[in-house]
A protein has these predicted regions:
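Substrate-recognition element of Asp-dependent hydrolases with the DxDx(T/V) motif
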Residues: 24, 29-56
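Asp-based, Mg2+/Mn2+-dependent phosphohydrolase catalytic module
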Residues: 3-8, 12-18, 22, 35, ...
C-alpha cells in the first residue's frame, strides 16, 4: 500500500498566540489517521526529534525528513502553504485546513485542498477505492 506523509501542521490547530507552540490536535485527526492505517496505508508523521509525537495510535511511524522524490500513489499532507520541511517532487500534495488569504504573491499550488484532516482522509480513501 502507498505511504502518506503528514506534516505536523496538518494535525494541529494553530495557536492564537505566536509565542505558544501549536500542540492541540485538530478534532477528528486521530480517527482520520486510524481510518488510513486500517485501510492499509503506511502513515508517517514528519517531526524533528525535539518535537513531541502526537497520540495517533498504533501503526503510525515517524520520520525527520521527506524522501527526495515521492512515488506514484504516495501522499503528502500539510497545513502550511510553505512547509518547513520543504515540498516533495512527485506524489500528490494536499493543503489541509483554511487557505490563507491571497496576497501580492500567489500561494503555491497543491494538487488538492481539504478543509480538515478528515476530509483529506476521505479523499484519499475514495481515490484508493476507485483506482
Amino acid at each position: 500500500m502507498a505511504a502518506i506523509y503528514l506534516d505536523l501542521s496538518a494535525l494541529r490547530l494553530p495557536s492564537m498566540d505566536p509565542a505558544v507552540p501549536d500542540e492541540q490536535l485538530t478534532p477528528g485527526a486521530a480517527q482520520a489517521v486510524g481510518h488510513l492505517v486500517d485501510a492499509g496505508f503506511e502513515v508517517v508523521v514528519l517531526a524533528l526529534d525535539d518535537e513531541p509525537m502526537p497520540p495517533l495510535g498504533d501503526g503510525v511511524t515517524r520520520a525527520e525528513m521527506l524522501p527526495e522524490h515521492l512515488g506514484a500513489g504516495t501522499w503528502y499532507l500539510t497545513g502550511d502553504p510553505y512547509p518547513a520541511l520543504g515540498r516533495p517532487r512527485g506524489g500528490t500534495t494536499v493543503l489541509v485546513g483554511p487557505r490563507p488569504a491571497a496576497g501580492k504573491v500567489p500561494l503555491p499550488r497543491f494538487d488538492l485542498e481539504a478543509r480538515d484532516l478528515a476530509a483529506a482522509a476521505m479523499e484519499i480513501l475514495t481515490r484508493d477505492a476507485m483506482a
